[in-house]
């Protein structure tokens, strides 16, 4: 007898859109090649490249837009979401199922970018766990920080920050989707948020920078912007993102209370 698949397995299968993922992979691979060419230098190592994960240009112009493509493709499934809602016993299970799936996809997406960078760097950069000559000379303001923390620790923290940012945007995308029932509206909202962040950053509008994320996703930028003690690791940057995620999660929970879940399940059951 064939084992019945769990709701999470079904939802993850829905997330797997072969053509979309292949297109996203190609775009990411090409962009990472471009970063590799730009950063190729005997004075740099692989950690200089990994630091780019949370830099303004890669995030704004490639990483966030391609991530939004993946989310939009998934939430455009239509009837499959109705079927999955019918399989869930209540709103809480339905909501947490989607949140869990977004977390898993965000993890896979973040690891994929790091994996592409590492594979492309094998024959170009050194992998020793020490700061490059370029980093030491360029980040003179952060000399104390560089002495206290290794590039491996910094790279792991950078990957975690990338995950937190993308998961927050994914959660926001989902909350708007619950409210509007339109993946295109969700895409437009989050994409405009990204554009506004870019405008504030490029325009150097200091009064609005605290509202947006550029200064709080790169540890180097965060330490410089807020003139932090470089002898202590800036754990507050992670607390900031965790608190934001908690707020958006709670807002989503309030929004989903307005959904007539039992009625929708009945309609979906009838439609099937």
UniProtKB/Swiss-Prot annotation:
Topology of this chain in the membrane: Multi-pass membrane protein
Organism domain of life: Bacteria
Subcellular location: Cell membrane
Record-level GO cellular component terms: plasma membrane
KW Zinc-finger (keyword) present: no
Principal subcellular localization: membrane
UniProt keywords, alphabetically: Cell membrane, Membrane, Transmembrane, Transmembrane helix
Segments passing through the bilayer: 20-37, 57-77, 97-119, 155-177, 184-203, 234-256
Name of this chain's protein: Uncharacterized protein BH0177
């Amino acid at each position: 007898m064939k084992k019945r698949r769990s709701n999470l397995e079904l939802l993850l299968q829905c997330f797997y859109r072969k053509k979309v993922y292949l297109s996203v992979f190609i775009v990411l691979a090409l962009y990472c090649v471009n970063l590799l060419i730009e950063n190729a230098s005997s004075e740099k190592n692989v950690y200089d490249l990994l630091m780019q994960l949370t830099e303004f240009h890669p995030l704004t112009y490639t990483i966030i837009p391609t991530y939004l493509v993946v989310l939009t493709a998934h939430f455009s499934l239509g009837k499959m979401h109705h079927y999955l809602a019918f399989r869930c016993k209540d709103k809480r299970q339905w909501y947490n199922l989607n949140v869990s799936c977004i977390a898993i996809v965000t993890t896979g997406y973040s690891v994929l970018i790091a994996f592409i960078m590492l594979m492309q760097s094998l024959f170009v950069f050194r992998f020793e766990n020490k700061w490059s000559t370029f980093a030491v000379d360029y980040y003179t303001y952060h000399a104390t920080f560089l002495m206290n923390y290794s590039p491996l620790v910094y790279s792991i923290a950078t990957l975690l920050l990338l995950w937190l940012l993308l998961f927050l945007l994914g959660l926001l995308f989902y909350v708007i989707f619950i409210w509007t029932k339109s993946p295109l509206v969700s895409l437009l909202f989050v994409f405009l948020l990204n554009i506004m962040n870019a405008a504030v950053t490029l325009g150097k509008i200091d009064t609005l920078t605290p509202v947006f994320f550029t200064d709080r996703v790169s540890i180097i930028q965060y330490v410089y912007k807020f003139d932090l003690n470089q002898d202590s690791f800036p754990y507050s940057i992670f607390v900031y993102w965790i608190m934001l995620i908690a707020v958006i999660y709670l807002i989503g929970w309030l929004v989903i209370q307005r959904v007539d879940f039992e009625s929708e399940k009945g309609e979906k059951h009838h439609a099937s």
